[in-house]
């Protein structure tokens, strides 16, 4: 099964997450199929905190990829910000 989830990066105490498409069996920060965007929870004012490639997200959801609950929340947040 293919999932859309967060892959952690950054240093200790300064998290940064890539939004990736990966096989469910692969570890959290392991191999992924495609990177769809990023989420920076510690973004300062004027910095971009969330970016998602909507066209690729639509494609992967269309072929059956399941977003994690957190990614689902971030997708809704990005949609509100864009509107």
UniProtKB/Swiss-Prot annotation:
SUPFAM superfamilies membership: Ribosomal protein S16
GO function term, MF aspect, one: structural constituent of ribosome
Keyword Protease: no
Biological process (GO), any one: translation
Organism superkingdom: Bacteria
Listed InterPro entries: Ribosomal_bS16 (IPR000307), Ribosomal_bS16_dom_sf (IPR023803)
Gene Ontology cellular-component terms listed: cytoplasm; small ribosomal subunit
Protein keywords: Ribonucleoprotein, Ribosomal protein
Family membership: Belongs to the bacterial ribosomal protein bS16 family.
HAMAP family hit by this protein: Ribosomal_bS16
Protein name: Small ribosomal subunit protein bS16
Organism of derivation: Acidovorax ebreus (strain TPSY)
Gene: rpsP
